[in-house]
């Protein structure tokens, strides 16, 4: 009876060995649903170039997460993450130079009304009174460190009307982020290349709602889009995030790419950084240059002690395990659970 609520029973939990592994195949799944909150409000904020402001903002977000105010986490993007979903690389203004010059980056950011860093989060409360108190806490925590902080209530969602157009637009899957794959592409522009990002201006008041994305014209393979992700897990504090950001800025610039960075809270104490390398595959040598840059990022993150949240098929060729008995134990488990080696051979360092 309680199997779907407490499936572990007595003894070791085996769940973890099937996470990001090739030790088994999922055949059954149970989804836990939660009651609709009585009050929902979204907020958006932006931060300038100051490293101290970035540190203080991240430390404040960590405290809000630890205290339970931000139970659903937050999203935090640098300007390039948003710009790449709103427009192409400004080739004419840059005079063909890559990566994007700092002065032009600031100018494009100013025209778009963006901060150097831009974030959003959601408050879930029992009722409006509880929500007002949580808003006060968020304002007092973030207000002193950010350039802009706005709130937007979603009356339809707070009233439990999950079928309203605004709620459906907010919750529906979107391919808008695919636009960043076209950042360096000079031709074959998809019809929806000019659009407002979900974390762009006005994101606090119904962010993402009412934005129309027509992805039918996008074909990344046909259009020669190159896109590589690196996703290290970072301690959620300003010092470590700043080290990671500085590393990305230095490595990408030295290889001719922009530092396209996003931070996604993966818990109360950690954040996943998503670093994107976008390039034009039709340019000779770009594939190789992007791979070299990716390898350099992965090596730097490993040296700093930031493990990958997800591994690309390229990264799976090399082991990133610590120098302990983990690899040997995993190999024995693999041999026991999949003696013929038929499940995703060569993946996940097994």
Feature map (PLM): residue ranges:
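Short beta-strand-to-loop capping motifs
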Residues: 45-50, 120-129, 231-238, 277-281
């Amino acid at each position: 009876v309680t199997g779907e609520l407490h499936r572990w029973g007595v003894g070791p939990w085996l769940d973890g060995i099937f996470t990001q592994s090739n030790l088994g195949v999922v055949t059954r799944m149970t989804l836990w649903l939660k009651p609709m909150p009585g009050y929902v409000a979204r907020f958006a904020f932006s931060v300038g170039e100051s490293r101290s402001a970035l540190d203080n903002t991240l430390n404040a977000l960590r405290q809000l997460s630890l205290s339970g105010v931000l139970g659903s986490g937050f999203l935090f993007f640098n300007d390039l993450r948003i710009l790449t979903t709103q427009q192409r690389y400004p080739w004419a203004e840059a005079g063909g130079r890559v990566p994007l010059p700092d002065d032009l980056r600031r100018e494009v950011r100013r025209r778009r009304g963006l901060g150097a860093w831009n974030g959003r989060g959601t408050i879930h409360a029992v009722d409006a009174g509880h929500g007002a108190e949580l808003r006060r806490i968020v304002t007092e925590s973030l207000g002193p460190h950010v350039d802009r902080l706005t709130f937007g209530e979603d009356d339809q969602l707070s009233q439990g009307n999950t079928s309203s157009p605004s709620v459906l637009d907010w919750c529906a899957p979107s391919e808008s982020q695919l636009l960043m794959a076209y950042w360096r592409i000079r031709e074959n522009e998809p019809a929806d290349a000019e659009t407002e990002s979900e974390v762009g201006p006005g994101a606090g008041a119904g962010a993402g709602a009412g934005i129309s994305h027509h992805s039918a014209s996008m074909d990344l393979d046909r259009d020669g889009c190159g896109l590589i992700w690196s996703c290290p897990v970072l301690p959620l504090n300003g010092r470590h995030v700043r080290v990671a950001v500085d590393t990305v800025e230095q490595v990408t610039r030295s290889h001719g790419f922009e530092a396209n960075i996003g931070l996604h809270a993966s818990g109360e104490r950690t954040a996943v950084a998503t670093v994107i390398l976008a390039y034009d595959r039709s340019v000779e040598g770009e594939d190789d240059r992007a791979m070299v840059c990716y390898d350099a990022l992965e090596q730097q993150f490993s040296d700093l002690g930031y493990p990958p949240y997800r591994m690309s098929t390229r990264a799976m060729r090399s082991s990133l395990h610590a120098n302990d008995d983990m690899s040997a134990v995993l190999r024995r488990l693999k041999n026991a659970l999949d003696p013929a080696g038929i499940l995703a051979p060569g993946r996940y360092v097994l």
